[in-house]
Amino acid sequence: MSKNQSVSASEDEKEILNNNAEGHKPQRLFDQEPDLTEEALTKFENLDDCIYANKRIGTFKNNDFMECDCYEEFSDGVNHACDEDSDCINRLTLIECVNDLCSSCGNDCQNQRFQKKQYAPIAIFKTKHKGYGVRAEQDIEANQFIYEYKGEVIEEMEFRDRLIDYDQRHFKHFYFMMLQNGEFIDATIKGSLARFCNHSCSPNAYVNKWVVKDKLRMGIFAQRKILKGEEITFDYNVDRYGAQAQKCYCEEPNCIGFLGGKTQTDAASLLPQNIADALGVTVSMEKKWLKLKKLSGEPIIKNENENINIEFLQSLEVQPIDSPVDVTKIMSVLLQQDNKIIASKLLKRLFTIDDDSLRHQAIKLHGYTCFSKMLKLFITEQPQVDGKGNETEEDDIKFIKGILDFLLELPKTTRNGIESSQIDNVVKTLPAKFPFLKPNCDELLEKWSKFETYKRITKKDINVAASKMIDLRRVRLPPGWEIIHENGRPLYYNAEQKTKLHYPPSGSSKVFSSRSNTQVNSPSSSGIPKTPGALDSKKHKLSDEEYERKKQKRLEYERIALERAKQEELESLKQKLKLENERKSVLEDIIAEANKQKELQKEEAKKLVEAKEAKRLKRKTVSQSQRLEHNWNKFFASFVPNLIKKNPQSKQFDHENIKQCAKDIVKILTTKELKKDSSRAPPDDLTKGKRHKVKEFINSYMDKIILKKKQKKALALSSASTRMSSPPPSTSS
């Protein structure tokens, strides 16, 4: 053991003696008891992580991950960002940082205790009356994470079924913990070593719920410093559920005698520790209320669903807020709260703030995200129910208006938080349901519309500017100030004062000491380059003349540095503009070429369409001419053969000759009609005049055929007669 540890142990022993002198029971140490951890692990299934009944269960109601505003701080290969001594807003509001989601604090920061399973060293031992117990193997500091309470995360119906089942199976111990409304952790069969933590009416630990990624997880934390060998206990009456009340063996002076069950007695905690702290409730306030209830003879009933005493909660007067610590406690509970009664009590306390520094603290601790969630909670169709079971929708409306008024009072900041929380969208939906709130909503939205949005400083920005500026990770700014990024350079910005500075504002704390032993106020350790006017290691008094000369030299150096920075920024902007113009020119050429190709394609397509149309019209014209010719042929063929047969001279021809004559006559008549008018169709009915003309044409045609036939016959006879009258040719002897 080191010297410091010896001193610490001595101080702890003094504290125990003092407590004993004041009437408190001295802390018992069990470090001599055998370590039965291995034996205890055989009594249940040890889980690496909780088992969820479905994907939806155990999920934190706010789906958007909330980043902290810390910056990574590596030393000896370890990222010390977001540690116990930091102002990490995630740590303060019970949210763990997640690798690759927190953009500025870097990976593997110190706010990942659940994810990395950074448990305190503990051991299991056998107690006299309580079965197994958990003891500290080393001293545990106040608020240190001890262990995660793991098990099967189930819904309320399954929880009630298991209560009955375990009771019927005569289980001696119960291991249910409420995770959130309607959801429970059951560590009876599957869990972690934390299930063996026993109850005490004067506990040294407490249970708290943390948001890890998108899930709520439950951890056990030290309420005060716990000595090595001391048993680790918490108050079951607040945090744990069981079917039947059981005898308590904690042996504390204030022991109430029983734990579990539905009825609370004299020393029972009426509220979970974190809610009591957020409301400013002290142990003396609880005892006073319990005493009054006992004197009146009334039973003290806790809420079956949430294990809190609604009657006590409703009786509380609003406690004033005195410090940023109070704001932190309230905001950490509000972010996880979906109980309207608890939320309304916390909001009433928050509404009493009349100091801008405290309002800034509320904004800093994911304020806009929290108020967005609260508005949604009170907008829901389900009205608030008071301690007597009465629905009070008017109270819901009152709190919605109260939140709007509080938001209106908040000092001006950047618009980043409003946009990331989407609270403006929630406010825009209110007038549709509550028209009388439209003026309040419009006024608030008008105020927010004037806020400016800035890029946040990122890890990359810090690395680039590291040699030219103060290490931003170690600068603590006054309320209302934040670090933004503008034109590639970090600035200190106060939206309320409309002020931007290149260096930390007055009122900010000095640069925090780094983890090395460098001098914090020296220019080199703070990240500011040494100037000719920097302090020498050996200080000596300067004459007025020498002081003025050094001052002028320093001012000249700063002026030159400022001019150089301006020139560099101007050159950078010119280069960016040149590159932008070149890219624009190339883009315009590409667009022009694309348009040209598009026009050519359009022309080709147009020509193709015109050619197709011309071809179609030609086909249509030919087709129409052929159709008319066919119709005229059909028209004449309907009566020409009959007229030929009736002609007296037709008897001189056989059937085939008459058929051929009919075809020829029809073709001749059709040709004549089309020559007269190529677009005229044949009439539907044959007129007498037309019939007469066709008949005359047929008679004329037949006469010509007969005449030709006779002439041909006569010519043939004449030729034959000539051959017969000619003397035969002479033959030679």
Curated annotation (Swiss-Prot):
Residues 1-32, 504-548, 672-692 are annotated as: Disordered. Its EC number is 2.1.1.359. One of its GO terms (molecular function) is histone H3K36 trimethyltransferase activity. Residues 548-630 form a coiled coil. Residues 506-528 have a biased composition (Polar residues). The modification Phosphoserine is found at S10, S522. Residues 22-31, 672-688 have a biased composition (Basic and acidic residues). Residues 244-260 form the Post-SET domain. Residues 120-237 form the SET domain. Residues 475-507 form the WW domain. PROSITE patterns: AWS, POST_SET, SAM_MT43_SET2_1, SET. Changing C201A: Reduces dramatically histone methyltransferase activity toward nucleosomes. It is an enzyme of class 2 (transferase). Keywords: Chromosome, Coiled coil, Methyltransferase, Nucleus, Phosphoprotein, Repressor, S-adenosyl-L-methionine, Transcription, Transcription regulation, Transferase. One of its GO terms (cellular component) is cytosol. Residues 619-718 are annotated as: Binding to RNA polymerase II CTD. The AWS and SET domains are necessary for transcription repression. Belongs to the class V-like SAM-binding methyltransferase superfamily. Histone-lysine methyltransferase family. SET2 subfamily. This is Histone-lysine N-methyltransferase, H3 lysine-36 specific. It comes from Saccharomyces cerevisiae (strain ATCC 204508 / S288c) (Baker's yeast).
